[in-house]
Design a protein with these regions (language model features):
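Short, conserved active-site loop motifs that form the nucleotide-linked donor/cofactor pocket
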Residues: 30, 61, 148-149
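Conserved core segment of the aminotransferase class I/II
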Residues: 57-127
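Inter-domain helical "communication" segments and dimerization helices
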Residues: 28-29, 114-117, 146
Length: 163
């Protein structure tokens, strides 16, 4: 819901609430899978709350994200936040699954996050990506007539169409 690819459209708060209400009407039977892979890269506004954040720990949202966009493409660590009612079943089914990411990498990332380095890193990245995005937008605006170009979105390489 933070933005839809490739259009860059953001799901409005009212629609998010409607979606959560729809899932809540059938508890244990309807779940929303939220793949929030780069919501931390908003430049002009604060990040919007995730559906999982709006629903809470008992809500009907399975939240997925990754560190490959926010840190580096080579850091292939993703994570999932399950509703409490699904956690036991997941642990029972996958208790022997060791994952594909080594413990060293996981522990290094955990220390990076708990030490506050991840938050500082994101602030630097937002500044750098905003500057790059602004330079791209300026170059596009000088290269095309206003009626030929439509720009939308907040992502580092915003969506553009040429008429």
């Amino acid at each position: 819901p933070s933005h839809q690819f490739p259009t860059g459209v953001t799901m409005p708060a009212g629609r998010r609430a409607e979606l959560l209400h729809w899932a809540a009407r059938a508890p244990g039977r309807r779940y929303i899978i939220e793949d929030d892979y780069d919501s931390e890269f908003r430049f002009d506004t604060r990040p919007l709350p995730s559906l999982q954040g709006m629903a809470g720990a008992d809500g009907p949202v399975v939240y997925l994200s990754t560190c490959s966009r926010s840190l580096a493409p080579g850091i292939r660590i993703a994570y999932m936040v399950l509703p409490r009612q699904l956690l036991g079943a997941w642990q029972a089914k996958y208790r022997l699954y060791s994952g594909t990411v080594g413990r060293f990498e996981q522990q290094t990332l955990a220390r990076f996050i708990t030490g506050g380095y991840f938050t500082r890193h994101l602030a630097r990245e937002r500044t750098a990506y905003k500057a790059r995005r602004d330079a791209l937008v300026a170059a596009l605006r000088t290269s095309f007539a206003p009626e030929e170009l439509t720009l939308r979105g907040y992502t580092p390489a915003c969506t553009c169409w040429r008429s």
